[in-house]
């Protein structure tokens, strides 16, 4: 399948497509024949056009049987690999640009080898560019999807750099059970970049691994906007100055963020948030295995601020050492001697878990985390008056608190720190 033009994506077709599902058989599809990829927008339509794309169907069942679906066996891949060499490089295309009045959901799909060349300005991402204008909204929803091997070759330091998997110029993204892996940028977001105060990024049960981002957010760069993360693992990414970095607001709960000193230089989390952004951490494991570098760096003026709401295992130093920028909690456990925190690699499950004494670390409850989310996160410059409440509603919709990232039951009365329940 190839989309040769954008002729079918017009306001005239909005009414036909609104509310429809598109079922896609397993296979590899070159999604566009132009560097900018496929642009989807319906400017002037009265509402967001809602489209759902479901992958993973048996090709032999096409037009016959929707029951024959197995996304693992019948892998559905949208690619920009026009030169068919298996990597994102010159001659390849970006994948999707989402403009005004589109709300598109992909389920059970892989997005691979999207490429954005650094001398062009017709797209900012190898994978998805979310860029609604003043006359509409753009929403991307991904469920059980993979974004891999995308590359934004934007010049280091420029506004076009970064966000190789997803570049959020302006809009909303909701990622549930999504893997972002092996994407690359010269700087500012090897996997994701958020670039506007009106942009919102929700993440649940995601894995961000193997991405390369140069500097300033080698996994995620929050130049602006709002990040809400639950039950997610960020590890084995490479670069410097924060695997998560930026001045946008950050709500990070029940997540495991561990970077290896052999892969990175600089802090794991580099925060420049203003107090009005109300950024906070709760019930996470956050470690920097590079003992010479901080785990959390509060950068910028003295007005910047990040708060712990407790139950975090924090391994490594926090800088500046003496500061009002980072508010600690008596229910956290901090130690620059990382080994004493008893975080171990579980090779059978390929995850980091806490193996400490339960009597030495107070565990929190699901209700306490939910309450912190819904009542304590109302960042400024946000489309919602209470963004935490909106995030909480979405987490309930996707049943985010009943299981850990591997699908194992969570003990709601004694949650283990990080993304996994032992």
What residue ranges belong to the model's regions?
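Acidic Gly/Asp/Thr-rich repetitive segments characteristic of extracellular carbohydrate-active
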Residues: 1-25, 30-39, 406
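Predominantly extracellular beta-rich ligand-binding scaffolds that present long acidic/polar faces
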Residues: 19, 32-51, 62-69, 130-134, ...
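Acidic glycine-/aspartate-rich tracts in secreted/extracellular proteins
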Residues: 27-30, 56-64, 82-83, 111, ...
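Right-handed parallel beta-helix/beta-spiral solenoid domain characteristic of secreted/periplasmic
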Residues: 48-119, 151
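Beta-rich catalytic cores
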Residues: 92, 124, 162, 188, ...
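Surface beta-loop-beta hairpin patches that serve as ligand-binding interfaces in beta-rich domains
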Residues: 367-370, 374-422
